[in-house]
Amino acid sequence: MSVSSPSSIRLHLPLVFVGLPGAGKSKVGRLVAAQLGVSHVDTDDLIEKSAGKSISQIFMDEAEQGFRQREIRAVHQAVQMGGVISLGGGAVTSEEVRDALRDVCVVHIHVEHDELVRRVTKKAHRPLLREDPDGMLRQLRRERLPLYEEVETIRLESDDGPASEVADRVVDLVDLGWKRIHVGGDAPYDVCVGHSIPVSAIVGALRSDASKVLIVHAQPLVTKAREVANGLETMGFEVGIATHPDGEAGKSLDVVARLWDEAGRMKLGRADAVIAIGGGATTDTAGFVAATWLRGIGLINIPTTLLAMVDAAVGGKTGINSSAGKNLIGCFHPPLRVIADLDYLSSLPEKDFVAGLGEVVKCGFIRDTEILRIIEGTDTNLLSDPRSSQIRELIERAIAVKADVVSADLKESGLREILNYGHTLAHAIEKCENFSWRHGEAVGVGCVFAAHLGVVRGLLTDADVERHVSAFSRVGLPITYSGTSFDELLDVVLSDKKVRAGQLRFVLLDGIGNAATYRISPDEARQVATRLGIA
């Protein structure tokens, strides 16, 4: 169905380009895919790859009927990839192809006859058209124009201007269904946030010469990993799959060595990549493997927990544990892309989902106060629903906070320390409780503790403390702690990485939304602990 007013519709993936020879389908398709950050495929390329011979050789060996059957299969395969697709000019002559495009967004690039003749006359690889471009194009237009009009979602006119202008017009009409949050710095990348993000978003971030990927995941995610692998294999990639023990047990040198062996077995090259599917333990471990194999290859993070989406998977930190402590072995290795598909959250245990909100609330206090306003103005039932629009906005905003901070300070030399708001005490609670407390639960207590320290320092008011208590409570997180003694907690705090020359250093707020690091005396910390009933 043709749409007369382009501005009245929104396009979505998969996105198919059709048109006569010379219309610019492949060039515009590549430009659009690059701007959207997804894969592009030309069905003629798929046909040649699967057949192992050129299009002209297929016509010689199998005649047009054999080629069209291959083309039908290629179109179905391309549509399943969910990216940008450029069809051969005659593909729509097959009824099966037209049927496959019924529910797909199809852009018909229409070019006036004289301009089309000018274009194809310059193309040395079109011998048939070169003999009589005017007559042949008139014939093709008569035969195919009704078929293009049958399948088109929208028709765009192309003149003698650059293909980039047509591509820009298409991109303006596309609704990806997900948001891209940019992380800047020396190694920039995007975080894609939304539902049902297709495999084309993974491929769009890989190097153009990548041919192999190693998927690393925890055992409970074997089905999800297989789904991703199937999609990548459909697109021609060699895929290896490796599991690791769930949780912190997977962050060991033995596990990493086994993953290195798998990378070696696959002969992963510099152009290839590791894909991490899982929570923070997976992104930490797989990221370290990617950072160290061949001194660094590509990494795609697909976090499946809320905590990993808003924290571990974004920022470029990788690491494993040792007998000396957690995350002491690692390096900074930014990913090529992060795919935060919110569909994964629907199967996340409720306690893990709630704990992940701890980092979200923290981001509201240190940087984006709109997060707090959303939490304060949203029904608590919606705050516990992973599919609510409010949760999606909260996640997007929390990721944007981290992206903004990491863009300015990847290696935690200054600004990035503000992301540790609430973490000094939180890490101590986690360790003293043998990690039976979830990270986000401990962060809630740690932020309330830090807010009280802010009052002692004259940086915050009692009302600001109450706002902390209310925000963390509304999402279901604890705001008090009555476990081990404060002396035991203090011993752990004194070993915190932020301690300098025996001085405690806490991230505090000088007003909501304005975080910085302060030196705190043990007496000040004890005063607050006593006030909160931590003996």
Regions found by a protein language model. Give the residues of each.
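C-terminal charged capping/lid subdomain of soluble metabolic enzymes
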Residues: 352, 358-361, 459-535
